[in-house]
Design a protein with these regions (language model features):
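Glycine-rich nucleotide-phosphate-binding loops and adjacent flexible coil segments
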Residues: 248
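Short, compositionally biased segments
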Residues: 1-5, 261-270
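Hydrophobic/aromatic ligand-binding patch that stacks against planar heteroaromatic rings
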Residues: 16-19, 36, 68, 98, ...
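ALDH superfamily catalytic-core signature
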Residues: 46-49, 70-71, 76, 83-238, ...
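A structured beta-alpha segment of the ubiquitous adenosine-cofactor-binding alpha/beta core
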Residues: 55-78
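Conserved small-residue-rich beta-alpha loop and adjacent elements
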Residues: 1-51, 125, 257
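Short alpha-helical
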Residues: 6, 32-35, 62-63, 83-84, ...
Length: 270
């Protein structure tokens, strides 16, 4: 099962790996991206992959995905998506053995709290450039996107002032235009989940900052699309985050220099 981020690259990469290892493939794309998946399979067939070796199975995870992963004829699963779903898959196939007594392998790429730690020696301008690119490109819909920015207390205010200013210059709209910095999130459900998280942080008293450049052409698109403006949320501690927020939301945690050793282990345990 591939993800809705980079829906052609990840999808065909998983297929190619399985084919190279001598397997036939039942390819289920994310339910949001069936058309690009169909095009990818058509290209593979045109390139010479035998028709019986790869089958495209679009549909919802709860139906098509569940049927695939519970079928004993499926001898291996590759998955890109949430940690919760990967854990469920692991439980479903953990006790399944083939006729030779071998377990069913699961290869899963899931979420996490990607962090950047900035100390007082960092060049602020470079930090802001890198943060904007990592946190907000592709509307934050990347496994590698920055989720938590850890700022040493001595440089936090200056860095945040510059970062807020840069966010206010970003254009949000149709990603087909070269002038656009931030496009929509994948669907209405994703938008609702992100907005629910932002509202929950506001309710806890956390400082929330949202800004994009005002533009009448962009604003018309905002009303009809699943747009979430780039968002900055200041937290009291890293431990407030329990799961990855998959969108253009950056969390900020301040730290003192003598706390650095303890901070370094937080992202790895998330």
């Amino acid at each position: 099962r591939s993800s809705d981020l980079f829906p052609l690259a990840i999808f065909t990469g998983q297929i190619a790996a399985a084919l190279a290892a001598g397997n036939s493939v039942l390819a289920k794309p994310a339910e949001q991206t069936p058309l690009i998946a169909a095009q990818g399979v058509a290209i593979l067939l045109e390139a010479g992959v035998p028709p019986g070796v790869i089958q495209l199975l679009p549909g919802r995870g709860e139906t098509v995905g569940a049927a695939l992963t519970t079928d004993e004829r499926v001898r291996g699963v590759m998955f890109t998506g949430s940690t919760e779903v990967a854990t469920l898959l692991q439980r479903n196939i953990a006790s399944r053995l083939d006729p030779q007594g071998r377990p069913t392998p699961l290869i899963a790429e899931t979420g996490g709290m990607n962090a950047m730690i900035v100390d007082s020696s960092a060049l602020t301008e470079q930090v802001v450039i890198d943060v904007l690119a990592s946190a907000f490109d592709s509307a934050g819909q990347r496994c590698s996107a920055l989720r938590v920015l850890c700022l040493q207390e001595e440089v936090a205010d200056h860095t945040l002032t510059m970062l807020r200013g840069a966010m206010s210059e970003c254009r949000m709209g149709n990603p087909g235009r070269l002038t656009t910095d931030i496009g929509p999130v994948i669907d209405a459900e994703a938008k609702e989940n992100i907005e629910r998280h932002i509202q929950a942080m506001r309710a806890k008293g956390r400082t929330v900052y949202q800004a994009v450049r005002e533009n009448s052409e962009d604003a018309r698109e905002w009303r009809h699309g699943t747009f979430v403006p780039p968002t900055l949320i200041e937290l009291d501690s890293f431990d407030e985050l329990k799961k990855e927020v998959f969108g253009p939301v950056l969390h900020v945690v301040r730290y003192n220099r003598n706390e650095l050793d303890k901070l370094v282990g937080k992202p790895s345990s998330s």
